[in-house]
From Swiss-Prot:
UniProt: S-adenosyl-L-methionine binding residues: 9, 85, 88, 113-114, 168, 211, 236
PANTHER family in alphabetical order: DIPHTHINE METHYL ESTER SYNTHASE, DIPHTHINE SYNTHASE
Protein name: Diphthine synthase
Organism lineage string: Archaea, Methanobacteriati, Methanobacteriota, Stenosarchaea group, Halobacteria
Keyword set includes Plastid: no
Protein origin, superkingdom: Archaea
Role according to the record: S-adenosyl-L-methionine-dependent methyltransferase that catalyzes the trimethylation of the amino group of the modified target histidine residue in translation elongation factor 2 (EF-2), to form an intermediate called diphthine. The three successive methylation reactions represent the second step of diphthamide biosynthesis.
Organism the protein comes from: Halorubrum lacusprofundi (strain ATCC 49239 / DSM 5036 / JCM 8891 / ACAM 34)
Length: 265
């Protein structure tokens, strides 16, 4: 049996009760934290809180050599953990398909995701979001600007009146000069806003910082203004709103501090 368990957004307590029970009853527990991280807890915190040993795998190991996970699932109850929800990444869908092909029963226990939290915290309606995109560090894509794919996604959504979630790059184990096991870097919202402001400086944007934590921050303003502010510890993301329903506009003013004249434009 292979159970995929989403850990939620922030720390060892963000998991659902159902997920916690499945985790504690597993014979072996694997985890992958490349796709996203729990910035409020490390592996030691998770192991202590859930009274279990966790075997962390690199993303490449999950994608290219998942045999240890699959073999464990054939022999007993195995749990596979990620931050957020495990099925957001195609890497984990592939692992589930491999398990099913080998006759291994699978189960998914969902966790809260950054996208659902972004909608909840900002007051932007869930069904008015379009395709999401990820903004990489400039060195990660070999340029010094915003990739065309990111611009195309935002513009396509805006043309349809839809909001865009912009996930911000995470680099763990790889830095500007190549592989580095000690490298851990998170793009912050001010850096992202600065990159996107080159061409959209007056565009409305919303920062969501540390969703799921006790000190989550939501702030809305022009991209150029957000680029000059600091939002504290990661994880951060940006939302580029499309057309606003009047309730959404009120929410951005009341919950995120957006200038009233900006949401009326």
């Amino acid at each position: 049996m292979l159970t995929f368990i989403g850990l939620g957004l922030y720390d060892e307590r963000s998991i659902t009760v159902e997920g916690r029970e499945a985790l504690r009853s597993a014979d072996r527990v694997f985890a992958e934290f490349y796709t996203s991280r729990l910035v409020g807890a490390d592996v030691d915190d998770l192991e202590a809180y859930h009274d279990t040993e966790i075997e962390v795998r690199a993303r490449e190991g999950v994608e290219q050599d998942p045999e240890a996970i699959l073999a464990a699932a054939e022999d007993g109850h195995t749990a596979f953990l990620t931050a957020g929800d495990t099925m957001i990444s195609t890497t984990h869908t592939d692992l589930r398909l491999r398990a099913e092909e080998r006759g291994i029963d699978t189960r998914v226990i969902h966790g809260v995701t950054a996208q659902s939290a972004a909608s909840s915290l900002t007051g932007l309606q869930n069904y008015r979001f379009g395709k999401a995109t990820t903004l990489p560090f400039p060195y990660a894509h070999g340029g010094d600007d915003v990739p065309g794919s990111v611009i195309d996604t935002i513009e396509a959504n805006r043309e349809r009146g839809l909001h865009t979630v912009v996930y911000l790059d995470i680099k763990v184990g790889t830095g500007p000069t190549g592989p580095d096991p000690d490298h851990e870097e998170y793009m912050t919202a001010d850096v992202a806003a600065g990159l996107l402001a080159d061409g959209w400086e007056d565009a409305l944007a919303v920062v969501v910082a540390r969703a799921g934590s006790p000190d989550a921050v939501v702030a809305a303003d022009r991209l150029s203004a957000l680029a000059d502010r600091e939002f504290g510890d990661p994880l951060h993301l940006l939302v580029i709103p499309g057309d606003l329903h009047h309730v959404e506009a009120d929410a951005l003013v009341g919950l995120a501090g957006a200038p009233a004249e900006l949401v009326e434009e």
